Amino acid sequence: MVHFTAEEKTAITSVWGKVNVEETGGEALGRLLVVYPWTQRFFDSFGNLSSASAILGNPKVKAHGKKVLTSLGEAVKNLDNLKATFSKLSELHCDKLHVDPENFRLLGNVLVVVLAVHFGKEFTPEVHAAWQKLVAGVASALAHKYH
């Protein structure tokens, strides 16, 4: 179980309140598919993923990125219970979709990069550390059913 201090919770929620879920989600998932091209195999139904511009402009990538980031919003609301929050999604990704759980960690790291780019100096080392802890906790919760 991940424990967040009051300061970490504030750092996470203060940034989250300013996140454009649609834009940031699409960019994070798009970057994942570009930077780690082997992750594309889980998105065969998304159509053209042949280049960075095709991926970043793909409406299905953007829509799924929004969906992913919307679920991350549930983590922000339930920082003290990530495992239960992601129990059903963990089961889906493990049993039905067979997603490599390492991809959750990779996507979390890419999301932190996207947030740093968007928030610049506001994304201080302390804020970065809190978000890194969050995405690691979410990745662990999503990987739970694999163990």
Curated annotation (Swiss-Prot):
InterPro entries: Globin (IPR000971), Globin-like_sf (IPR009050), Globin/Proto (IPR012292), Hemoglobin_b (IPR002337), Hemoglobin_oxygen_transport (IPR050056)
GO biological process: hydrogen peroxide catabolic process
Full protein name: Hemoglobin subunit epsilon
Residue list for modification Phosphoserine: 14, 51
Keyword terms, alphabetized: Heme, Iron, Metal-binding, Oxygen transport, Phosphoprotein, Transport
Species in which this protein is naturally found: Notamacropus eugenii (Tammar wallaby)
Binding sites annotated in the UniProt record for heme b: 64, 93
Record flagged with keyword Transcription regulation: no
Molecular function GO labels: haptoglobin binding; heme binding; metal ion binding; organic acid binding; oxygen binding; oxygen carrier activity; peroxidase activity
Domain Globin: 3-147
Function: Hemoglobin epsilon chain is an embryonic-type beta-type chain found in prenatal and neonatal marsupials.
Superkingdom of source: Eukaryota
Summary of the tissues where the protein is detected: Red blood cells.
Family recorded in the similarity comment: Belongs to the globin family.
Gene assigned in the entry: HBE1
CDD domains: Hb-beta-like (cd08925)
Xref: SUPFAM superfamilies: Globin-like
Assigned GO CC terms: blood microparticle; haptoglobin-hemoglobin complex; hemoglobin complex
